[in-house]
A protein has these predicted regions:
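Active-site-proximal beta-strand/loop segments in catalytic clefts of secreted hydrolases
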Residues: 71, 138, 202-205, 252-258, ...
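Active-site segments of SGNH/GDSL-like serine hydrolases
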Residues: 293-300, 315-354
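Conserved SGNH/GDSL esterase-like catalytic core that processes O-acyl groups on lipids
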Residues: 36, 54, 83-92, 167-168, ...
Length: 421
């Protein structure tokens, strides 16, 4: 395994011997890459009746067409009567003249069965890297609870019930309600001739973005995306290798409270990593790299080091079986807390388990590389605690400054081209 070191390196020669010319030739052929994604973790408490929702999602790569995937993992069968997608300019407003109708197998409507998933036809639309898209979905049924990702740290919008079908409307005016959950929208694929693939950040609340800033996109993986798209960052697009190979997409598949396995007690309140790997990672298009950043919630729920490690091994083996690279991230410190209700708290024995798992991640695990986030955020005076300026206040999550430093610590060379799913 390689440690994250200097970011300077020489321009490569490809295995074909054609060097960057060959890379550019491959890049110029348009291909579908997942440019945004999220993980569903339950059903919304909001009931929709003859209403329209407008979900806001920031795609991480440019392209000339998109297709949207809608999942209904936790909902009853639902009909989407109409769907539109367009560039968001502010709040819930779509840029004038850009809202495009979405079709599913040629139809403007689609029914998604309980637990089902649908992907739209291609929609011709120019998108930029890190551009916000508004995906509007009309729900004609009554008392519908959406399958959702809660706590998306992004403002989305929906109408009052019985407002009807306003999916084609470009103004925010009818969208009088706000939510920070993501309803039905699972992912957005981008047809790109400049992106070589996608990086999936597979984790818990520290990937999901707890303690980050609403609508600011300041999670650790957001900063990785910014750096990949920056001409200033060493090892980024403007500095040699990456500007020849194109911009990698970064996809956030974090769920607050998520665990690696289901062996902990009390049981996890969302599908653990070993169970959702196919749905939330391997089903995406154009994936080249996976970052596995979990484990703290297993330990909090009384899992042993062996149980966490066995779960990580399972994920590593399955990712590598698809020909993808997998990068491990060390578990950051967690402050002691007494048990309260179903929360089993944290104590020195759990810190010892964390340190044992981290030792395995650093020295024995079959990861292709390691991101040592533990070293980035820990307190120099006490490595079993989060550095006070980097602690958001709960002793569990980084502050925005901590997330920034985590994103800045990532060696972008780790995302060099690899096999693609």
């Amino acid at each position: 395994m390689l440690a994250a070191v200097s970011l300077a390196f020489a321009a490569p020669v490809s295995a074909s011997g054609r060097g960057d010319e060959g890379d550019r030739g491959n890049r110029e052929r348009p291909q579908w890459i997942t440019g945004w994604g999220t993980s569903q973790n339950g059903a919304s408490a909001v009931q929709l009746t003859n209403a329209t929702v407008r979900m806001i999602a920031r795609v991480s790569i440019p392209g000339d067409a998109v297709r949207i995937r809608l999942d209904n993992t936790y909902g009853a069968a639902v009909t989407i009567g109409s769907a539109y997608v367009g560039p968001r300019v502010q709040a819930g407003d779509v840029a004038a003249g850009t809202n495009r109708q979405v079709h599913f197998a040629g139809s403007p409507s689609v029914t998604i069965p309980a637990g089902g998933s649908v992907t739209s036809d291609a929609v011709q639309i120019q998108v930029l890297a890190r551009q916000d898209l508004a995906v509007s979905l009309y729900v004609p049924q009554a008392k519908v609870n959406a399958s959702q990702h809660s706590g998306a740290v992004v403002s989305s919008y929906y109408t009052s019930n019985d407002a009807g079908n306003v999916a084609a409307t470009e103004a925010r005016t009818p969208f009088v309600n706000t939510t920070t959950s993501m309803w039905w929208l699972k992912s957005i694929d981008v047809r790109s001739s400049s992106s070589p693939g996608a990086i999936v950040a597979f984790g818990d609340s520290i990937t999901d973005g707890t303690c980050t800033t609403l609508d600011a996109h300041d999670r650790w993986e957001d900063w990785v995306s910014v750096r990949l798209d920056s001409t200033d960052a060493p090892g980024a697009p403007g500095s040699g290798r990456f500007n020849q190979r194109g911009l990698k997409a970064v996809v956030n598949e974090g769920i607050g409270g998520n665990t690696v396995t289901r062996t902990s007690s009390p049981p996890p309140d969302s599908a653990p990593g070993v169970e959702r790997l196919e749905r939330d990672v391997l089903s995406h298009t154009g994936v080249t790299h996976v970052v596995l950043f979990m484990g703290t919630n297993d330990i909090r729920r009384e899992a042993s080091a062996a149980q966490v490690i066995d779960g990580m091994r399972n994920i590593i083996e399955r990712v590598k079986a698809r020909g993808l690279s997998i990068i491990g991230a060390t578990i950051i410190p967690r402050h002691n807390r007494p048990p309260a209700g179903t929360n089993t708290g944290w104590n020195p024995a759990k810190t010892a388990i964390r340190n044992e798992v981290n030792r395995w991640i650093r020295t024995e695990a079959a990861f292709d590389d390691v991101l040592d986030f533990d070293k980035v955020v820990r307190d120099p005076a006490d490595p079993d605690l989060i550095n006070p300026p980097l602690n958001c206040g709960d002793g569990i999550h980084p502050s925005p400054a901590g997330y920034y430093l985590m994103g800045q610590s990532v060696d972008l060379r780790l995302f060099d081209d690899s096999g693609r799913h």
